[in-house]
A protein has these predicted regions:
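A generic structural signal for tightly packed, nonpolar segments enriched in small/aliphatic residues
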Residues: 1-247
Length: 247
């Protein structure tokens, strides 16, 4: 595993932290995917790739904001040192997570990255990830999901995305579902059952953002749409358009 950090314009007045999920290949671990389910899993690092794409464009166009990118880089494989169902992990901010399903690994690596970013108290934390199949069930292959604790910023992001012809739709960050990830052994568990999976994943991430404004982008569908060959780069231009209009 690696944890890559990149900084642009760290002395700017407005500072943004951008976290990208970087699972280079996802077998599901001991909660093993089917062979068909693994076919596109080399694109499970689309969030990390997008994050680096965004900072590249921001730097090349000399934007006034400060941007720090954090990308945890792993593979989710079966091995003698792999995490197991039932393991309890202690995260960077001290909270503990019971692993119920090793195929819900993205939120585990992103929890530490979010906590690390939150320690710097940026003006805004964004994350982008191929996080849940539930978001694909809800929105299909062409629409990304947004979750946020700041409705005004979320609305502005969605408008910026529409202006460059990418579609995002807000999903509810419904605190009533927090109980679905309660654990008897830890502060939370990494899955919340069959229903509302995109929401419970977002609620887990919310545990690691501190008091910061935050937008979570779940791009599991459009990042690897069947409508074109390979990964799509979905979200890069939306984030760039959004960041250049922040103040």
């Amino acid at each position: 595993p690696y944890f890559l950090v990149g900084k642009y314009n760290p002395k700017a007045k407005y500072q943004v932290s951008l976290i990208g999920k970087g699972v280079l290949f996802d077998t599901g671990g001991y909660s093993l995917k089917s062979p068909a389910g693994m076919e596109t899993m080399k694109t499970d690092m689309s969030g990390a790739a997008s994050a680096w794409g965004v900072i590249n464009i921001v730097a090349r166009t000399n934007q006034d904001i400060g941007l720090t990118v954090y990308t945890p880089i792993v593979e989710n494989m079966v091995s003698g040192s792999a995490i197991r169902p039932g393991d309890v992990l202690k995260t960077r901010n001290g909270k503990t997570i019971e692993v119920m399903n090793t195929d819900a690994e993205g939120r585990l690596i992103m929890s530490d990255a979010l906590a690390y970013a939150a320690e710097t108290n940026p003006d805004l934390i964004c994350d982008i990830a191929t996080l849940t199949g539930a978001s694909v069930v809800a929105l299909g292959l062409d629409i990304g999901a947004t979750f946020s604790n700041n409705n005004d910023l979320e609305k502005k992001f969605i408008e910026c995305a529409k202006s460059i012809k990418e579609e995002f739709h807000p999903l509810p960050l419904f605190d009533g579902y927090r109980k679905l990830i309660d654990s008897d052994l830890a502060d939370m568990k990494n899955t919340g059952g069959r229903f509302g999976g995109a929401i419970t994943a977002a609620l887990l991430l919310k545990e690691f953002i501190g008091e910061n404004d935050w937008i979570h982008l779940d791009i599991a569908g459009p990042a690897r749409s069947d409508n074109r060959k390979g990964a799509t780069g979905f979200g890069v231009l939306s984030l760039y358009e959004f960041f250049k209009n922040l103040d």
